[in-house]
Amino acid sequence: MQLLNNMKSEQECIEYFVSSFLDEQHGNDYFIAHCMGVYTILKQMGSPLEICLAGLYHSVYGTENFTPVTRLTKHTVKEYIGDRSEDLVSTFCSLKNRDISILKNLNNYNDRKRKDLLYINYANLMDQSQSLDDPKLKSLLTEYQSALSSTSPVFNDTKNIIEI
């Protein structure tokens, strides 16, 4: 089923993602578990569906620190999650020095895109922090909270859903 805003239903997007990456590893866990964690955190924070789906697919093309075995084409990803979500995924995957790039907005993204990237990577780091006890990661999450608080008044109301 194709929806009006050039994307498939949420359920179809999730099912396709899961079937594509069923056995993919990500560190000591499955890639699906991490990405579903990111998606769930974004949902709990009340993020729009486009952002949640971008969070689910956030590293399907590979990143500086992760290279998936399964390869999806941009065309296929766009077909499922839509143009805006795919653009966020593509941007996220291509970022070098991701945290500095996003926090300092080194690529001069417009306010909306920067805020979306802040949310996606905040959820990404939150999911990782649940299995790692890393003081640097906790400090980085605090920086993201500060950046999100200044760009999104809604964040102040939702950030306590998940404690660091």
Where would I find each of the regions flagged by the language model?
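Active-site helical microenvironments for divalent-metal-assisted chemistry
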Residues: Q2-I164
